[in-house]
Amino acid sequence: MVSKKQNIYLINWLNFSLVVIILMVIIGAITRLTQSGLSISDWRPVMGIFPPLNESQWNEAFDYYKEFPEFKKLNFNMTLNDYKTIYFWEYLHRILGRFIGLLFIFPFVYFLSRKFLNSSLIKSLLLLFSLGVLQGFMGWYMVKSGLVNNPYISHFRLAAHLSIAFIIIAYVYWIKMSIMYPDKNKKSLQKYNHSINFILFLFFIQIVYGAFTAGLKIGNYWNTFPLMEGQFIPYGLWDLEPAYSNLLNNKKMIQFIHRAIGIFLLISIYLFSFKLKDLSLDFNLKGRNLVTAISCQVFLGIVTLISKAPLVLAASHQFLAVIILLLLMNTKHSLKYKR
């Protein structure tokens, strides 16, 4: 039997882990927005913890970077000082990833040895660890896609990398909440669960299309709202063959879908908040928080689009998406477990 004090240690560990993972996601956004993601062209899980420490090592790293298409085709005028700037963000992103790995492994082993963990929690944490390992490999797999003749990362791999990050955040939060509130609700709230599951499904589709928009740099085009090229539904959405490829590669279609899902999410959450009013004051507050967050996100998305995705706005847009996910997971957990 795990004591309350032991649970507090577990909750604090998961809370801290959650903060660091969210920080990792924001730094990942900055790394992408500053075009820093291909600055480190190899993957050394152990020796990669050491950055260049003197001028000779910096020149060696820069010379290695010069061998790849990003320098040859895009950054041929880059100086060593410019390179140090983009190296910093990618290095910080990678070193934080390693820190998260250690932040999981050492406390997990300690808690396991002290019998803080029941069998169900052990399984959940091992699954979480597997997701973390998968995310590490996906990050490198994504970088590799930009080290070839076309010096741009695959928007499909970026979408996978970002989606896994959001899944990890949701899962860490769910595990933490399940430790805090382990008793299931007896009251049937199935109709509310269906609604929140639908919203979560829409949310993750939106994350994918947000990654497509970012990976293909579509934020630089059609910088008006609500119209695109003077129309609500612009021409050219189905120009590619076969038809399904428009959903994956047509820049105009991808931005249109990202806009449309954003509005659809706003409406869905607004309607869902009315349902929650019937339950309790607590659920009413959760509904209002969701409406406020999604309203701010839609507004921020529009401003980011109109201003052609400047770094601060675009990174804030990604951060607010994390907040919305946490609010959704909190509401979903509250529908299933007693408070």
Regions found by a protein language model. Give the residues of each.
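Hydrophobic cores of alpha-helical transmembrane segments in multi-pass inner/ER membrane proteins
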Residues: 100-106, 162-179, 264-271, 321-336
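N-terminal signal-anchor transmembrane alpha helix
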Residues: 12-49, 202-213
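Individual transmembrane alpha-helix segments
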Residues: 64-102, 245-265
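Interfacial helix-loop-helix junctions of multi-pass membrane proteins
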Residues: 31-40, 137-158, 213-223, 298-322
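Membrane-interface junctions at the ends of membrane-embedded or membrane-associated helices
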Residues: 4, 115-119, 174-187, 276-281, ...
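Small-polar-interrupted transmembrane alpha-helices in polytopic inner-membrane proteins
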Residues: 16, 20-27, 123-143, 198-206, ...
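Membrane-interface helix-loop-helix junctions at transmembrane boundaries of multi-pass membrane enzymes
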Residues: 112-126, 273-290
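Membrane-interfacial catalytic/cofactor-binding modules of polytopic membrane enzymes
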Residues: 207-265, 270-274
